[in-house]
């Protein structure tokens, strides 16, 4: 049996093809190919008579296998993410976007690939607030974001739909910011997703804090997503489609806010492309940040 140790540690764990496969798939390699590479790595270590190996040795061998198979970009990404995780730098990813655009699915997939255990939806925060704040005190949190405008009393300047939306967001953002503060204070990795992740309302300060605005390419795309969503939800697609005008107005508002605050806007057309765009953006920005500290995250293993 091959056992794996971290340099400078006495703890040895059994080599796991499953764990290595997940590491390889995190950079966009198909799971079947990733598993075959993991087997090749294990077989080569066995052939060399290795019973104890370091994680660095596994990283180096895996990197070489990816390069040999022509996956140079994937090898670079693999090298980066292994080194990033080894540094134990807390990572905070914030995903905003309109109702039904696929934020939860993206968050779950990102969490799997990056080994992040904490995924928090802002709808859960809103639900907690509904239990402690009465409708009489704050009516806009007791309805959907695209219907909150109906609870606004008196006249508003500008769009009533956006006024209602902002009213709900400003309340939920208090809880979102509290979670962000705790994650930063305790050095936790987390992904926070939801329509209430709005630039200007949510704190994005911090070197390893990344916000993205996920949007639909078109009204038709979003409508199709609502029909798909009903396969896993009790709520009818018609509920959302009957309010598509309001939802699209909120999307336009979110795009404007994102551009104003320099937050990347990503059209969620294909899940894999969206995941790759987010991970590559995090990688590129982190590489630049680490360069300023004199660290080369892409130095080839020796």
UniProtKB/Swiss-Prot annotation:
Cofactor: a divalent metal cation
Enzyme Commission number(s) from the entry: 2.7.2.16
InterPro entries according to UniProt: 2PKG, ATP-cone_dom, P-loop_NTPase
Broad class of enzyme this protein falls into: transferase
Reaction(s) the record says it catalyses: (2R)-2-phosphoglycerate + ATP = (2R)-2,3-bisphosphoglycerate + ADP + H(+)
Pfam families xrefs: ATP-cone
Recorded superkingdom: Archaea
Gene3D superfamilies assigned to the protein according to its UniProt record, in alphabetical order: P-loop containing nucleotide triphosphate hydrolases
UniProt KW ATP-binding keyword: yes
SUPFAM superfamilies xref list: P-loop containing nucleoside triphosphate hydrolases (SSF52540)
Known pathway: Thermoadapter biosynthesis; cyclic 2,3-diphosphoglycerate biosynthesis; cyclic 2,3-diphosphoglycerate from 2-phospho-D-glycerate: step 1/2
Keyword presence, Nucleotide-binding: yes
MF terms in GO: ATP binding; kinase activity; phosphotransferase activity, carboxyl group as acceptor
Keywords: ATP-binding, Kinase, Nucleotide-binding, Transferase
Domain ATP-cone: 2-89
Function: Catalyzes the phosphorylation of 2-phosphoglycerate to 2,3-diphosphoglycerate. Involved in the biosynthesis of cyclic 2,3-bisphosphoglycerate, a thermoprotectant.
Family: Belongs to the 2-phosphoglycerate kinase family.
Protein name: 2-phosphoglycerate kinase
Gene assigned in the entry: pgk2
């Amino acid at each position: 049996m091959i056992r794996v140790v971290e340099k400078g540690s006495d703890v040895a764990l059994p080599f796991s093809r499953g764990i290595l496969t997940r590491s390889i798939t995190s950079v966009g390699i198909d799971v079947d190919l990733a598993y075959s590479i993991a087997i090749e790595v294990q077989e080569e270590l066995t052939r060399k008579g290795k019973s104890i190996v370091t994680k660095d040795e596994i990283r180096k061998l895996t990197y070489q296998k990816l390069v040999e198979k022509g996956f140079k970009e994937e090898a670079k990404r693999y090298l980066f993410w292994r080194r990033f995780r080894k540094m134990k730098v807390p990572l905070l990813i914030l995903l905003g976007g309109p109702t039904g655009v696929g934020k939860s699915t993206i968050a779950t997939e990102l969490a799997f690939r990056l080994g992040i255990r904490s995924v928090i939806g802002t709808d859960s925060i809103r639900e907690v607030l509904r239990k402690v704040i009465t409708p009489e005190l704050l009516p806009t949190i007791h309805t959907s974001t695209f219907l909150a405008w109906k609870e606004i009393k008196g006249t508003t300047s500008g769009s009533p739909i956006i006024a209602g939306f902002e009213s709900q967001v400003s309340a939920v953002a208090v809880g979102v910011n509290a979670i962000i503060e705790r994650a930063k204070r305790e050095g936790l990795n987390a992904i926070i997703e939801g329509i209430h992740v709005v630039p200007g309302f949510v704190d994005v300060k911090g070197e390893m804090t990344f916000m993205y605005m996920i949007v639909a390419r078109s009204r038709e795309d979003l409508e199709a997503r609502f029909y798909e969503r009903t396969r896993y939800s009790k709520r009818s697609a018609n509920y959302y489609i009957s309010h598509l005008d309001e939802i699209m107005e909120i999307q336009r508002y979110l795009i404007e806010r994102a551009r104003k605050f320099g937050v990347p806007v990503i059209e969620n057309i294909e899940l894999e492309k969206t995941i790759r765009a987010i991970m590559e953006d995090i990688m590129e920005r982190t590489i630049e940040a680490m360069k300023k500290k004199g660290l080369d995250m892409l130095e080839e293993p020796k």
